[in-house]
């Protein structure tokens, strides 16, 4: 197994390069993520005005999840676990200056072959795959979803390859471009959707135009990073380098990481599956709530952990340096996420009103999404800290531990969600009020003496 070498030694202990503070790198990452998230938020604002929470919006959100399986399983999370720690140590070693490029070329070659095969299968099997993963969609929504899935697959394939670029650039401490590149992905969707709207196309046609934006934007997000990747690692050569300990180490960690990401992705599809039991608009409500919920995760947590992962990997033999970085990062995460949770729960309604309530997006939609956002916010801090612990495990080569814990999390979340959704299904939103429209299935004996009139049960 490959073991990187730290260049500096002090009193027999490897010395960390603390002259490169993770806080500065986190600010650079945060700037890129902020611009990217802002463009994503603008995209959602425009789509909400164009499509609301109706059939075309549900179809677009559901369709994006299926090829998104490829991105989430093979993309940034998996490469963070398997590729970045090894590659970061490799570029600091003195043994062979060409080896990092050869290893990186091998990984992108294998990743490209796997991604291409999955994209082709996904396009050909879009209908049965959609039926299996989203079996409860209404017929009208399902047919549109299948068409959108076929268009989107190639775009998400390009985004997987752009995650490889992100890994290369992060390891070389070039953070901004890779995190700002998704602006092009969002911009392409916005432009295509607005062009369709300007031509007075139907909602379904606007959704199809946005799907083509997903494809074009994915290609642009990948291609814009290539020049800088070649600049920082000019020795990259496509092909498979045989007999490399570093390649073997990356591959040995890749498949457990894929399993871990698969478990997390299953959680997302479980949400979609359960939402299929609910009324039209449930997919869109979950998606919009997740976008707001993920803002502090993306802006604060991802900026911190993305800057820390290469340094954790380089400093893993220096316990004091690791401890200092971990404590500093955990304090930052706690500060940002606790405040964000309180803000989302107490001020979520006016925030959603300000962001989305226009066009076909109504005040009832605002209340609906606020409730979903408030529920998500209860786990915001735990989600952020789990990412930090996960990175620490990855830096020491442990990808199986986070995968097991992710499986436990999905089991608990799925069970609780399955039980509660049938209880909360007895609530409805009517004229900006939450009313109960029936007895709770599991607790009916407790409600024998309650008034049968739902109008008398307003909350």
Can you annotate each of these PLM segments?
Residues 2-455:
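Membrane-embedded alpha-helical bundles of multi-pass transporters/translocases
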Residues 457-459:
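N-terminal low-complexity segments that are often proline-rich with Ser/Thr-Pro
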